[in-house]
Amino acid sequence: EGALSQRELELLVLPYCHVENMGRYLDYGERHPELTTEQVATEVNIGLDRPFYQGIQMVEDPDSQTVLVNKYHQLSPDYKPDLVRMGTAYTYGTAYLQREAWEQFKAMADQARTEGIRLWNVSSYRSYGTQERVYDRYVSQDGQSLADTYSARPGSSEHQTGLTIDCNTIDDAFGETEEAKWLAAHCADYGFIIRFPDGKENITGYQYEPWHIRYVGVDVAKEIQKYGLTLEEYLGVDSVYAEPWQG
């Protein structure tokens, strides 16, 4: 057999190189010569060499606090986490979250209130069936291509985990409000991240959503905030960014 190429040698020394992905790395690198070897490995590991919703894997650890649910990782239709009802002063209508996420959201909202900021939930846990109805409505309204940029297909929504909250409003103008600025600055202190940040649409597959927060625990949230990552990049699903906290 012939000698390994320079790109293969560069890939093999990366701690997050998966040999079984080598063919995908090489193909993706050829299609994207502007990317570094590290970026090629990172993006292929995330799944970005494939169109969204292709090569979907079923989530194996749905109860993990850092569970990855996205356009490549899907929850089963019958998955339902352990939930508690959110206090009525903190939500619009009846709503449910996992207990720790609820307790931390309550603590965050209480602190925000002392600083003149009001935060409340407008959408938290959604069942598979509810998400199916939400998504179908958006597809009917805007067509599938556009709907896919702002709404998850059933099974691919983080809302099904009971770890996600839409705060205050799902209006693009929210990002310019004092509430949104406070949320972005302080949510990591309570274990939340802005799940779909501005400028990361190619990685998350979603438009910027300054209102959409996801509970991952304080330590992980602070790392994600510090390095300006998405959850996909943090988990890596093995990435160029792994070293600061894994090394």
Model-identified regions with their sequence ranges:
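Extracytoplasmic cell-surface/polysaccharide-interacting catalytic and binding patches
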Residues: E1-S124, Y128-G247
